[in-house]
Amino acid sequence: MQKRFYNKESINKLIVVKKPLFISSNSYLTKIKKKYKNKKAGFSGTLDPFAKGCLIVAFGQYSKLFKYLKKTPKTYKAVVWLGAISESFDIEKVISVDLVEKIDLDNIKYQLNSLVGELEYIPPKFSAKKIEGVRAYELARQGHDFELNKCKMNIYNTKFISYRHP
């Protein structure tokens, strides 16, 4: 009979953690595994390093539950920096910032609502999409030239929160 050095019930857990900015999902999982003193853990879904949000983390046999969890729809909150030009389309690699003219609030709301529905888009090169097992953002940081395939997404609802012009 095999001798256990841990409490069998405590090794199987399913938790939701809030991943902070500036860290990859894998790096954050490593911290979570150390905190809970558990080597066997995984997460569902990957957030870009420059995104913060919820990761579902499973320990032990509970990682088998991921296939039963509904992953959509998701909710996103974004801050849009008008006039900023960035190679990565986020706060990394900002090339320049230009002052833009004040935009009509009704026009902003109209454009935001026009996004509702099914959209086809090409993900940015600085994304967590994988190309032959490697994250696109890693290849982009190394200066590799590559193309990502188009993706489809559905936007079910938009909500305008605020607008502040400099």
Locations of regions flagged by a protein language model:
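Catalytic/RNA-binding core of pseudouridine synthases
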Residues: 1-166
